[in-house]
Amino acid sequence: MDSIENTSWCGFYLCDTVKEILYLGPYQGPLACTIIPYGKGVCGRAVILKETQLVPNVHEYAGHIACSSSTNSEIVVPIIKNNIVVGVIDLDSDLFDNYTLEDVEILEQVARIISELF
């Protein structure tokens, strides 16, 4: 990724509202967790809270799901359509404290644009 540096994994998880799970969508990087229950890990919490999760140190995040042992920081932005989370954008970094509030703003804009496709 050119505009958000030091990202080791970037992808989408899409919501299955019946089963209350996120399933892996398009991504760039090594194979990740394919199914995440709502409320579990950073992605699942973003769905439940309907808000961005900025995690400078995943090892200090209670309930973090380690899809890759090299991940040290993460940002997850919900994609919301008509007040319903339809998916999330998930970025991981091998560096601690890699993501900034500017990254949050950029990804939240991207999520708003993508939400129009649902």
Q: Residues of each region from the PLM?
A:
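Short loop/turn motifs at secondary-structure junctions and domain boundaries
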Residues: I4, C67-T71
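Regulatory sensory and allosteric helical modules in signal-transduction proteins
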Residues: C15-C67
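Short hydrophobic/aromatic beta-strand element in the GNAT-like acyltransferase core
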Residues: W9, V76, V88
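Helix-loop-beta substructure at the N-terminus of cytosolic sensory domains
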Residues: M1-Y23
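Juxtadomain coupling helices with adjacent low-complexity linkers
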Residues: S93-F118
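A short, aliphatic-rich beta-strand micro-motif
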Residues: S73-I80
